[in-house]
Curated annotation (Swiss-Prot):
PANTHER family: 30S RIBOSOMAL PROTEIN S13/40S RIBOSOMAL PROTEIN S18 (PTHR10871), SMALL RIBOSOMAL SUBUNIT PROTEIN US13M (PTHR10871:SF1). The gene is rpsM. GO terms for molecular function: rRNA binding; structural constituent of ribosome; tRNA binding. The lineage of its organism: Bacteria, Pseudomonadati, Bacteroidota, Cytophagia, Cytophagales. Located at the top of the head of the 30S subunit, it contacts several helices of the 16S rRNA. In the 70S ribosome it contacts the 23S rRNA (bridge B1a) and protein L5 of the 50S subunit (bridge B1b), connecting the 2 subunits; these bridges are implicated in subunit movement. Contacts the tRNAs in the A and P-sites. This is Small ribosomal subunit protein uS13. InterPro entries: Rbsml_uS13_C, Ribosomal_uS13, Ribosomal_uS13-like_H2TH, Ribosomal_uS13_bac-type, Ribosomal_uS13_CS. Residues 95-125 are annotated as: Disordered.
């Protein structure tokens, strides 16, 4: 397995797909990285020679924010929204959907597991 940006990328897959295992790199950026490095997209990672792997590593290190640096930047921007008290920050703080989705029926992913309320026994007449 090749190791790029602290992530083991699979050898048996095409380079374009393998690079998407790195947080912060999708299909489009993987294609542009491979084009700049002069590596064919369809070439499997196991077929890369050392020069190609080093070229890909250098491009990712110089031009892209990945893994820990990107995650910390995202966390800092969310924290900034919460600190300034804007609507998006309040939604993050409350654990509700941020982008205007309805919350009456759905949004279970964001709210978490249902919190059931105990039924009161019906008063007997």
């Amino acid at each position: 397995m090749a190791r790029i940006s602290g992530v083991d990328i699979p050898d048996n897959k095409r380079g374009e797909v393998s690079l998407t295992y790195i947080y912060g790199i999708g299909r489009n950026s993987a294609q542009s990285i491979l084009t700049k490095a002069g590596v064919n997209w369809d070439k499997k990672v196991s077929e890369w020679n050392d020069d190609e792997a080093n070229a890909v590593r250098a491009i990712i290190a110089s031009e892209h924010k990945t893994e820990g640096a990107l995650k910390s930047e995202v966390q800092l921007s969310i924290k900034r929204l919460m600190d300034i008290g804007c609507y998006r920050g309040l939604r993050h703080r409350k654990g509700l959907p941020v982008r205007g989705q309805r919350t009456k029926n759905n949004c279970r992913t964001r709210k978490g597991k249902r919190k059931t309320v105990a039924n009161k026994k019906k008063a007997t007449k």
